[in-house]
């Protein structure tokens, strides 16, 4: 997910995307704690995607 692509989305789409990413992060944390997570790098990817979405939302709020 690129920030340039996120900037083209509406605020409502970004909020929906953020909600989905937060749910994915929660599920990954649960899988990690139970030992079911094989690809641990996905936690880092989701965390950075969340940061990208929040950054774009803040940019749109300030504009």
Curated annotation (Swiss-Prot):
Molecular function GO terms recorded: structural constituent of ribosome
CDD domains: Ribosomal_L29_HIP
Domain of life the protein comes from: Bacteria
GO cellular component, one term: cytosolic large ribosomal subunit
Pfam families: Ribosomal_L29
PROSITE patterns given in the database record: RIBOSOMAL_L29
Record Gene3D superfamilies: 1.10.287.310
InterPro entries (alphabetical): Ribosomal_protein_uL29, Ribosomal_uL29, Ribosomal_uL29_CS, Ribosomal_uL29_sf
GO terms under biological process: translation
Key word Ribonucleoprotein present: yes
Keywords: Ribonucleoprotein, Ribosomal protein
TM helices/strands, residue ranges: none
UniProt cross-references to NCBIfam families, sorted A to Z: L29
Family: Belongs to the universal ribosomal protein uL29 family.
HAMAP family membership: Ribosomal_uL29
Protein name per the record: Large ribosomal subunit protein uL29
Organism field: Tolumonas auensis (strain DSM 9187 / NBRC 110442 / TA 4)
Encoding gene, per UniProt annotation: rpmC
